[in-house]
Amino acid sequence: MNGVLNSMRLHSSAWITALFAFALFAVVSFTNHILFRTYALDLGLYTNALYDYAHFRFADTSLFLPESKNLLADHFDLYLMLFSPLSWIFKSYTLLVVQCLAVIIGGFGIYFLLNENERTRPYRIWGMAMFYLFFGTLAALAYDYHSNVISAMAIPFFFLMVNRMAWGKAFALLVFMCFGKENVSLFLFFVSLGLFWKYFKVKESRKYILLFAVFSLLYFLFMVKWVMPTIAGEKDFVHFGKYPVLGGDMTAAIKFMIMHPFEFIRLLFVNHMPEDPTYNNEKVFFYLVLFVAGGWALFARPWYFLMILPIIIQKELTNQP
């Protein structure tokens, strides 16, 4: 308790910023929920799953699929089990409350990360406030819940622990983030590669970050090649069907990217669904918005581009835009 009070006294401006941010998030998120403007997939589905987990039952896919399977076969998300006891208190608002609080905590991660360096320390509050007011942050909270958001809010703390060479804490955060959803571990593989690039000249950092990359990749492969197909009773990871342009399964996707690298790059910029001309210029607009929203900084810190590469690929090549 004394530690919290000391933190509030030493970093009072950060706590005040976080308080105002939470009020804003609550107005956006809770108001939409009150007015029935929140989304059934995933918020409604996962709220139902919370109820099942809170009553010691496995959740299933019967709400959105004709064939009922364990919900973990769709996304291996362990956060819902962790948060399920809170549903006894917050009811249908549980995941919205958790998501808003997670973003607030993520803002503190940015604050303390900027506080580490004398050059960036004067901008710590500005960085925190910009994160809270960023349109992507507000959009994530507006009408839905995704466990990816919870995982992403641990990223600044992960960066902080890597910067401090606190490898045990960094690994604990890595494992926590992997528990959010199976595809988060693939993202963390690229995050680790980006950090490997950034800290390449530091031998100790290089060694541990490479281990983090290996762990993330093995976790991803273990989940999508064995655990989830086994739970689903399928031969392969079901969500690869959303990427027919890559071949429809992991092996075909990897082969396509290796054998046709220029075509793969081209598809990231053009409409890969020519039967629907609605999307003809959407990818170009996306990159323009990304550039204006801060993507220009990737030219100065290119390792961050490596980190977000799987997110761009997942967004641009799906047949469910």
Residue ranges with predicted function:
Residues 116-118, 150, 155-169, 196-203:
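Membrane-interface transmembrane helices that cradle and orient dolichyl/undecaprenyl
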Residues 139-150:
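Short acidic/glycine- and proline-prone juxtamembrane loop motifs at membrane-interface regions
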Residues 2, 264, 271-308, 312:
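Hydrophobic, aromatic-rich transmembrane alpha-helices
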Residues 27-30, 46-71, 78-79:
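Extracytosolic helix-loop segments that constitute the early lumenal/periplasmic catalytic or substrate-binding loops
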Residues 81, 89-108, 125-128, 277-281:
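Loop-to-helix entry region of an early transmembrane alpha helix in multi-pass inner-membrane enzymes
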Residues 1-27, 115, 121, 203-214:
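Start-transfer (signal-anchor) and selected internal transmembrane alpha helices
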Residues 169-198, 209-213, 306-307:
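Transmembrane-embedded, aromatic-rich helix segments that form part
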Residues 15, 104-136, 152-153, 169-172:
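Transmembrane-helix signature of polytopic, membrane-embedded enzymes
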